[in-house]
Structures are given as C-alpha cells and as structure tokens.
C-alpha cells in the first residue's frame, strides 16, 4: 500500500449537532478520513495541516461505510479555534 499525503488522509470535517457539542465539551474534532489511513497517519496529518498537537485518535466505520476519526487535542490547543479555522463554527 502506498503512503498517503496529508491532504489525502483527511477528507472533510463532520458537522453535526453532536460533533459541534463535542468540540466545546471534550476538545474533540471529528473528520471523515480515507479508509486506508491509520491512526498514526491521521495524527500526523492533523498536526501538520492544522498546527495543533493531538492527544488521541479514535476511529470507527459508520453505517454509510465511511471511516470517521475522533481527534482529541492536547491541553493548550483549542478545538474551538480549530473549528473556527475550518469554518465549522
């Protein structure tokens, strides 16, 4: 399998009422990512593209067969600032 570039790993942010609530309460942002991407690749892509530090990455496949990544940011980095940068909030 070939390695993916940073912009190929992250497809788009998920914008729902639940994910917007998670931004403010748990400092977590949700992305739909490439199915071939790993947690390590997702972490590197988020850190390089958005200039933040990632604490954890959790992934799941939803019913629409999309791979979602729940990215928790480290203390000192705000998910709300990242959401503003992405145009979510």
Language-model segments: residues:
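Contiguous, often N-terminal, cationic amphipathic patches that form binding interfaces
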Residues: 1-89
